[in-house]
């Protein structure tokens, strides 16, 4: 019975839902608050605290289709990806989980029922393994399910290993929850080489593990003793790629529908025909991990998770380059992936444009150095005396050309060389040491503090309260009392002080007794406790003292306004820039707010203006800011946005501002949006690849910012006006010089009328002021004579006449200019020696000028 990968996923979840399991969404590929994990690599990661008894949920049975990545740290499959049938950087793990609910019998029965009744797998193609001493599991398989004893294989501890070191015994660590497991294998047939589990040929590809059921039934102590857990649990995992291969009648995972669609698409965009090429497998695998890492907020960088992403992208690009790819190709596969992933690709579809852009930019950046780096690498390999490339060269390729060591290793391996990994690590460590020496770091006493107290937060309803001192610490050491001047951390049983979370900074204020005052400068979370950081301002304080808690209400109010403004800003950015915008971080203080978000290019001035307008419009609408507590699923149905990387309880606080913004948030907020008063963006910048930052202020600080901006504009305007005046003066000087030069040029056009010099001319491009200057210059040059100059500007005629003083008894400038003006539809007049006129009939000007000489002949 053929089933697509999407159908297998849906069938699995639906089956376990029918068995009373809660379908839980795949958690982020970025583990929440688990520094031991680089990426989510198993279905149980998000339930770790449930198995450890540290967290209780509303359900005791769960099922998931968890997205996983193994490409860095301990679980690093990168170098094998594309070269084996079942190694991937990205895979989906189908799982069902019991938290102190059902145990072995139900888990085994569920697994068998799903495989044989739902998927219709033939029972004679299945065999199972159990831990050597797990008679209970053996009997369930044999007597309850009916699997023949010869198809149930007992697996013991590894030879020479520690007790319980076995493929069929799971342990979280040296101590803690552990237990046996049973694995289900599928027999691909005699035509494929390989032996049954537990035989020397078990690493062959005939018998493939498809499902592992872990039974957590013991608590292992430091001395090695095993204590039965009061409520044993179940953790199972089945790789969707492996079971899909079986359902689609193929042997290699790369032959299933998901990979075949990606391989064909990659071949098409590259222009390559051989679909069996291993480089196409690499590209098909890598587009999955890269796309979903970006969806979950990881961006290419030179450190941590971002560097792993960059390594995978560059490995894919290099394999495309091997196949002859011209230009950027990798990002073109995102749409194909989103479609083929079916129901699991919905979030990728929503963020498709962002994912494509991140990949394209990274690919183009690497493409500029790939050719040069490959040339240097190939030259180094060509000139090698031995078969090992030195670590210094590997480091140079990494440091200068962005070649991750595993990419260099790939190329070297293809040419049957190895790399000096130890030498590379030495060079890397030297670089890290230089970086460490360049920085100065103090002691983090807070990291060493362990507190058993669980502090109750009562600050949603007020800024004052009373409590008792549960614990006090000075420089990381617990103390029983404090005296004036001591810098310390105080833990209370109950507090109105908000601990920094979700970007909102911690409260400040005072903790008082009749005997002393502790000034709280910051408030932080410390496990389940709330830590008040500060200094003993006066008097003394002892453990167990009853205290009054007083939050700085004015500061708290300012912070709450800015926090509410960040919610409006987030919603406005999504409206203006697109729904790909997600919060990547924030800092909310009393003075201002800072908001980091995903966007691949600088926000334009017009976009920032529109964001500001939208936020201020919502402030003016004065929405009531409503807070409702509901279960997480109801919150999601309501459309509440969740913060990237945040972990939420089953019961969450949903903050709504009209129909404009709905978010999950545990912070302190204003009562109405109108309380914010005014919102003003002060800066926008890029802080990392694909991450932008906006800084802003509200209320009086926003007014101050606007006034400061207005003053700055006024200053710039005054500077511009002064510059304009200076330029105008300089321009006039230049025009005067040009007029003087023009005057000298046209003197040659002067004629004599009855022994008197006369100059009549029409000039292009001269303004009236220039004409007057030119008339004066010409009169001075003539000594004795008559001048009439004309110009045309804006379809109007300008006329200026000049007569030297010795001739004003015979000819008056006003009469001359009036005579000409009347012919061009105008009028004018002036002094006997200088007169000005204008007209509107430009076409009549040439004939009017011709009448000047006859008119003068009659008077001179």
UniProtKB/Swiss-Prot annotation:
Compartment annotation: Cytoplasm
Cofactor note: Binds 1 zinc ion per subunit.
The EC number(s) this enzyme carries: 6.1.1.7
Catalytic activity, as annotated: tRNA(Ala) + L-alanine + ATP = L-alanyl-tRNA(Ala) + AMP + diphosphate
GO cellular component annotations of the record: cytosol
Gene Ontology terms describing biological process: alanyl-tRNA aminoacylation; negative regulation of DNA-templated transcription
UniProt-recorded Gene Ontology molecular function terms: alanine-tRNA ligase activity; aminoacyl-tRNA deacylase activity; ATP binding; tRNA binding; zinc ion binding
Required cofactor(s): Zn(2+)
Its biological purpose: Catalyzes the attachment of alanine to tRNA(Ala) in a two-step reaction: alanine is first activated by ATP to form Ala-AMP and then transferred to the acceptor end of tRNA(Ala). Also edits incorrectly charged Ser-tRNA(Ala) and Gly-tRNA(Ala) via its editing domain.
Family label: Belongs to the class-II aminoacyl-tRNA synthetase family.
Full protein name: Alanine--tRNA ligase
Phylogenetic placement of the source organism: Bacteria, Pseudomonadati, Pseudomonadota, Gammaproteobacteria, Vibrionales
Encoding gene (name): alaS
């Amino acid at each position: 019975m053929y089933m697509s990968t999407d159908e297998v996923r849906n069938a699995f979840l639906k089956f376990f839902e029918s068995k009373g399991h809660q379908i839980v969404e795949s958690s982020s590929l970025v583990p929440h608050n688990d520094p031991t994990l680089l990426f989510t690599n198993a279905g149980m990661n998000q339930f770790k605290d449930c198995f450890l008894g540290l967290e209780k949920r509303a359900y005791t049975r769960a099922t998931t289709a968890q997205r996983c990545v193994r490409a860095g740290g301990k679980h690093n499959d990168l170098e094998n990806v594309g070269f084996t049938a079942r190694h991937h950087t990205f895979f989906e793990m189908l799982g069902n989980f019991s938290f102190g609910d059902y145990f072995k019998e139900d888990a085994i029965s569920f697994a068998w029922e799903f495989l044989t009744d739902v998927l219709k797998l033939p029972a004679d193609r299945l065999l199972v393994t159990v831990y050597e001493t797990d008679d209970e599991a053996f009997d369930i398989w044999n007597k309850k399910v009916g699997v023949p004893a010869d198809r149930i294989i007992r697996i013991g501890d590894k030879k020479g290993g520690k007790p319980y070191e076995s493929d069929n015994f799971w342990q979280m660590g040296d101590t803690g929850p552990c237990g046996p497991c049973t694995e289900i294998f599928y027999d691909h047939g005699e035509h494929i080489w390989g032996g049954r589990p537990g035989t020397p040929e078990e690493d062959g590809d005939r018998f493939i593990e498809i499902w592992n059921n872990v039974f957590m039934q013991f608590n292992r102590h430091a001395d090695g003793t095993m204590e039965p857990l009061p409520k044993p649990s179940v953790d199972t995992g089945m790789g969707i790629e492996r079971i899909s291969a079986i359902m689609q009648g193929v042997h290699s995972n790369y032959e299933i529908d998901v990979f075949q669609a990606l391989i064909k698409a990659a071949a098409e965009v590259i222009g390559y025909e051989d679909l069996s090429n291993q480089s196409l497998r690499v590209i098909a695998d890598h587009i999955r991990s890269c796309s979903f890492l970006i969806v979950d907020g990881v961006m290419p960088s030179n450190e941590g998770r971002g560097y792993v992403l960059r390594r995978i992208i560059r490995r894919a690009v290099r394999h495309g380059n091997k196949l002859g790819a011209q230009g950027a190709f990798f990002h073109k596969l995102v749409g194909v992936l989103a479609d083929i992933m079916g129901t699991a690709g919905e979030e990728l579809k929503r963020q498709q444009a962002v994912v494509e852009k991140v990949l394209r930019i990274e690919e183009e950046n690497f493409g500029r150095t790939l050719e040069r780096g490959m040339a240097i690498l190939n030259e180094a390999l060509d000139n090698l005396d031995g078969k090992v490339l030195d670590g210094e060269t590997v480091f140079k390729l990494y440091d200068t050309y962005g070649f991750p060591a595993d990419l260099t290793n790939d190329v070297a391996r293809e040419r049957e060389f190895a790399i000096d990994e130890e030498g590379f690590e030495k060079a890397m460590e030297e670089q890290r040491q230089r970086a460490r020496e360049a920085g100065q770091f103090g002691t983090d006493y807070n990291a060493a503090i362990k507190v058993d107290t669980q502090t109750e937060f009562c600050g949603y309803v007020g800024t004052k309260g009373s409590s008792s001192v549960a614990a006090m610490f000075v420089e990381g050491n617990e103390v029983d009392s404090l005296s004036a001047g001591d810098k310390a951390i105080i833990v209370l049983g109950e507090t109105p002080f908000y601990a920094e979370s979700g970007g909102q900074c911690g409260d400040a204020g005072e903790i008082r007794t009749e005997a002393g005052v502790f000034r709280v400068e910051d408030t932080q979370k410390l496990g389940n406790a709330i830590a008040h950081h500060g200094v003993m301002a006066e008097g003394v304080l002892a453990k167990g003292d009853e205290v009054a808690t007083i939050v700085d209400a004015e500061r708290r109010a300012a912070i709450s306004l800015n926090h509410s403004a960040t919610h409006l800003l987030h919603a406005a950015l999504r409206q203006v820039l697109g729904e790909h915008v997600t919060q990547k971080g924030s800092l909310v203080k009393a003075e201002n707010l800072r908001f980091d978000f995903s966007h691949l290019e600088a926000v334009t001035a017009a976009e920032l203006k529109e964001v500001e307008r939208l936020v201020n419009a919502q402030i003016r609408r004065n929405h009531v800011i409503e807070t409702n507590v509901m279960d997480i699923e109801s919150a999601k149905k309501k459309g509440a946005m969740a913060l990237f990387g945040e972990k939420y309880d089953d019961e969450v606080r949903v903050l709504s501002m009209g129909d404009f913004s709905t978010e999950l948030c545990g912070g302190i907020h204003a009562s109405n949006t109108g309380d914010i008063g005014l919102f003003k963006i002060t800066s926008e910048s890029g802080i990392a690849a694909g991450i932008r930052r906006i800084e802003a202020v509200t209320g009086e600080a926003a007014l101050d910012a606007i006034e400061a901006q207005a003053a700055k504009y006024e200053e710039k305007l005054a500077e511009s006006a002064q510059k304009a005046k200076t330029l105008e003066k300089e321009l006039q000087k230049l025009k005067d010089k040009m007029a003087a030069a023009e005057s000298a040029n046209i003197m040659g056009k002067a004629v004599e009328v009855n022994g008197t010099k006369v100059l009549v001319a029409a000039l292009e491009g001269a303004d009236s002021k220039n004409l007057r200057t030119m008339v004066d210059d010409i009169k001075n040059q003539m000594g004795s004579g008559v001048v009439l100059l004309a110009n045309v500007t804006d379809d109007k005629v300008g006329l200026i006449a000049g007569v030297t003083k010795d001739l004003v008894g015979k000819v008056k400038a006003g009469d001359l200019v009036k005579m000409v003006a009347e012919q061009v539809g105008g009028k004018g007049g002036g002094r006997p020696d200088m007169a000005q006129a204008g007209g509107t009939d430009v076409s009549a000007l040439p004939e009017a000028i011709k009448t000047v000489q006859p008119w003068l002949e009659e008077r001179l």
